[in-house]
């Protein structure tokens, strides 16, 4: 038995000793087997610091058997080791073996890696459960390359470039379609209309603050449904206006006839009844009557009734 003080053991040598059967002082009694293990670990650490040592397959095999399978006469103190799962690679030329022993101070455990060089240009690595990264790399962040002001300036320039690209690709088509819809200078088919511009134009005519950017969240199917709904509402409104103008003309004629018969109380009735009142009160009924009579959206008929309504209000027919 040899008495070795604990302070003589190096801190980077990782050992796991059971404290059973040891006195509670700073001097532990270490057996010859334990001393041989410490010597072996010390030799491995020295080889790691000096250079990577290449051994023959027979020496590695005998050394592994000695490390992984201790003798039966070893003391009660147990040093836990993990046997790596390796595979045998048969190829020519005969492989050379190299063992690397890594000592981790944080995890307090030993990891082994075996590199098998198959040829000069290729190398197969057989590792244990713990994966080892030889050369870790890290991508530098923008905060290291550029300062805060530079990053903000780069973002602002990128936003300006994206806006310019977007305006250059869409402005000409949108402006052309908007001119067609607003002024009607050029005949066009319904498939050629930019439906988004038509929706925005209709919203602006009705006092709704809507822009093309607000419609970016809508899909093409939703734009088609909105455009179809607006078109149907526009046609329905035109039919109601035709029936409304007919009703106003009839009311003016009835008012003049009643005044001719001496009913002075009826005077001013045509002034009180406007298109807005008719639309609110019987607008849906006017649309139903127009649909039932087959009255479509006829611009000529609408213009004729509008002119006739103005003259009937000013001229006494009866």
From Swiss-Prot:
Signal peptide: none
Subcellular location: Host cytoplasm
Domain of life: Viruses
Any single GO CC term annotated in Swiss-Prot or TrEMBL for this entry: host cell cytoplasm
Pfam families: Pox_A11
Induction remark: Expressed in the late phase of the viral replicative cycle.
Keyword Transcription regulation applies: no
Record keywords: Coiled coil, Host cytoplasm, Late protein, Phosphoprotein
UniProt cross-references to InterPro entries, sorted A to Z: Poxvirus_A11 (IPR007755)
PTM notes: Phosphorylated by a OPG054-independent mechanism.
Family per record: Belongs to the orthopoxvirus OPG137 family.
Function: Required for viral crescent formation early during virus morphogenesis.
Quaternary structure annotation from Swiss-Prot or TrEMBL: Homomultimer. Interacts with OPG160.
Protein name, entry field: Protein OPG137
Organism: Monkeypox virus
Gene label: OPG137
């Amino acid at each position: 038995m040899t008495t070795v003080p604990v302070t003589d053991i190096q801190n980077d040598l990782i050992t796991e000793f059971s404290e059973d059967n040891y006195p509670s002082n700073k001097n532990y009694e270490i057996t010859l087997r334990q001393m041989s293990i410490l010597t072996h670990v010390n030799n491995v650490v020295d080889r790691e610091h000096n250079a990577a040592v290449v051994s023959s397959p027979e020496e590695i095999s005998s050394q592994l058997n000695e490390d992984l399978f201790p003798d039966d006469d070893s003391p009660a103190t147990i040093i836990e080791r993990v046997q790596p799962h390796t595979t045998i690679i048969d190829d020519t030329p005969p492989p050379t073996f190299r063992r690397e022993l890594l000592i981790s101070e944080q995890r307090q455990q030993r990891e082994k890696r075996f590199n098998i060089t198959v040829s000069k240009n290729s190398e197969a690595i057989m590792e244990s459960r713990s994966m080892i990264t030889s050369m870790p790399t890290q991508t530098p962040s923008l905060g290291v390359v550029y300062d805060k002001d530079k990053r903000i300036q780069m973002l602002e320039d990128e936003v300006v470039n994206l806006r310019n690209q977007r305006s250059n690709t869409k402005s000409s088509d949108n402006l052309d379609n908007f001119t067609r819809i607003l002024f009607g200078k050029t005949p066009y088919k319904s498939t050629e209309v930019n439906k988004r511009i038509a929706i925005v134009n209709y919203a602006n005519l009705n006092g709704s603050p809507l822009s093309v950017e607000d419609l970016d969240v809508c899909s093409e199917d939703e734009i088609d449904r909105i455009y179809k709904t607006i078109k149907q509402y526009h046609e329905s409104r035109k039919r109601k206006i035709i029936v409304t103008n007919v009703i106003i003309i009839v009311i003016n004629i009835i008012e003049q006839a009643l005044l001719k018969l001496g009913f002075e109380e009826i005077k001013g009735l045509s002034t009180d009844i406007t298109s807005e009142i008719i639309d609110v009160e019987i607008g849906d009924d006017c649309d139903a009557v127009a649909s039932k009579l087959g009255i479509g959206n006829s611009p000529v008929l609408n213009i004729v009734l509008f002119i006739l309504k103005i003259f009937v209000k000013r001229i006494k027919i009866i």
